[in-house]
Amino acid sequence: MKLLELAGPLLQTTTGSAAKNMKSSQGVFQNWLMSEAGLKELSEQGKGTPNSEDQLLADALKKIGEWLNASPEDQDKQNADLLQTLSKLTGKQLDANALQMLQNLLQAVESKMSGGTDQLLTETEKIFSEAKTALSANDSASDINGALKSDKEQSNQENEVSEPAKELIYIQMFISQLVEGNKLTDLGNGNEAHAIYQNGDQFLSALEKKGVSQQLIQDLKQQIFTKAESSSKLYSMTASELKSFQSLMDQMSMLPQKGTKEWSLAESQLKAFLLSKSSESSQDFGKSVLTPLSQSSSSKNASDVSGSIQPVDSKSGLQMLFSGYRGIGGVQTLDLQQMSSDIPNAETKTVADQVINAWKQMKYTPFGRSTGSFTIRLNPEHLGFVTIKLTNENGMFQSKIIASSQSAKELLEQHLPQLKQSLPNMAVQIDRFTLPVQSGDQPIYGQLADEQKQQQEGQRQQRQKKQSNDFGDLLDEVSMVEMEEEE
């Protein structure tokens, strides 16, 4: 600002060696600033009766509010007290309300300084105008020199910064320091994120030596260890996320080799972590999740099974997405036809793509520690349904994909390599994939094409009777939970 430029000589003569160290030590700058403003050093602030952090902040906000509501004349009288108040906030973690109050104070101070500058510039223009008049009215050199000397003296007098103006300069600088300091604290985890990023090459090299898939390494490079450090998602993580990721890196680096149970679990967690970060920025499925399936195994037949998509917040979405978190496994139904309005050209997607997209939508088992199943209705309708079951036997995950029609099964078999490669990267490590032929003890979900109904109705009823007790109990449990929620 122009007022700061006018006050430049004053600031230059008072900074001394403290200004040289301003970049390397914020405390040195604050001490110098308070000494120039006539305040005590930071080291002396602790004397007297100590107040709690909350009380200190409340008193400071009250003082700032009083200054903002005061008249211009009273504000000038309160400048010194305001400086003392701001000095007490040095090094404190400020909440959003306090930062907003400081922003309001900064705007008010800058507005006040801007008003004083405009007045000062007006007076300066008036002086130069009078000087021109004097030059044109006087022919002698002595008269001209006298006029210039008089004008120079008047200009110097006008350029002198008043005491309230100097205090406003200090207040402005103090507020800027407090706001910037808290911005660094909020980004706060920048040092931790930078430290993790610096170890990225070493971590990736260790993973390559242990035979980790190139797809996983590529995902790490695209999301975490990017070419441009500022693009890394490390800087958008919370402190707890950074701590978890660092712990996961350390664990995988210390494990002797790939193939152990511990390694499989750690690798599953890493893939789930990357998936969660990828899904946060994805716009394809992030705005909607599934509502729980409401049915019983005895009273509702398969033609009544359908899912719906409703927007919910992320916290409730996790609970609704996967009923397996109740501890007994779960069943979810995904209606891809209802999603067709959100997904362009859904009919043109392959069966494998539909399964993969459904897996994404489910955010299935975020940390690879839950089991269950969910059902997908395929597009077009005559393909019927596909059920994906995930089980955990002795710490090893297994996935079974059950097709309700022969045509869907054949299409899935054609794309089985793609499924094997893609599904584990979505959330969990799959140790064994099976795609069995439809048998009598496997349920069929949904309504088949018209030409298949009559032939398969009798078979469907027989298959329903032969469902396993565990699966029937599971559906009963889900139904009971949903009925309780409706009541």
UniProtKB/Swiss-Prot annotation:
The keyword tRNA processing does not apply. Residues 144-163, 286-311, 447-487 are annotated as: Disordered. GO terms for biological process: bacterial-type flagellum assembly; bacterial-type flagellum-dependent swarming motility. Keywords: Bacterial flagellum biogenesis. Gene3D superfamilies: 3.30.750.140. One of its GO terms (cellular component) is bacterial-type flagellum hook. Controls the length of the flagellar hook. Belongs to the FliK family. This is Probable flagellar hook-length control protein. The gene is fliK.
